[in-house]
Amino acid sequence: LALTLSDEKTLITHAENAAKFLGYEIFVRKSNDTKRSKYGVLRRVFNKRIQLALGKDTFKKKLLEYRVLEIKIHNGKEYWKAKSRPKLSNNNDFEILDRYNKEIKGIYNYYCLANNCSSLSKLGYIMKYSMYKTFAQKYRTTMSQIRKKYTKNGLFSVRYYLKNGTTKDLTFYHGGFKKKN
């Protein structure tokens, strides 16, 4: 192909070490776990499989970018705490909830191929409590009062009106963070 490679951008990594690409960590799994085949023979089916993983730093950066995460260090250990987004307080309830839903779904749709994408549930938790705090700040009340006011059938939802006068409810994302194939 006669391609020229840039020394700054090119990084050759051993397959067992994770290579970071587009927010994913790509590596070859090294595992001695066995599974029986349909003929009853033990096989190492998980060994030498290419894995896509989601690093903790990846969604930590995203949460910091959205300004919903406050990191506190106590006794050398990192604690994550959700914080409100004052810039969204001027929006109506539908716009606030819709923004949070779009951000969560966007991140999940991008990282749903990762083998450990269920770790995004921590991101969902932080985003949910950030949303509670944003609503509480907007109405100058507590998170528990906001949850009581907006929770219907166990789901956080906001009622909004359409142009023809009918009402609909927009619920907070509750689709889970399962790996997609």
Language-model features, listed with the residues they occupy:
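Non-catalytic terminal/accessory segments
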Residues: L1-N181
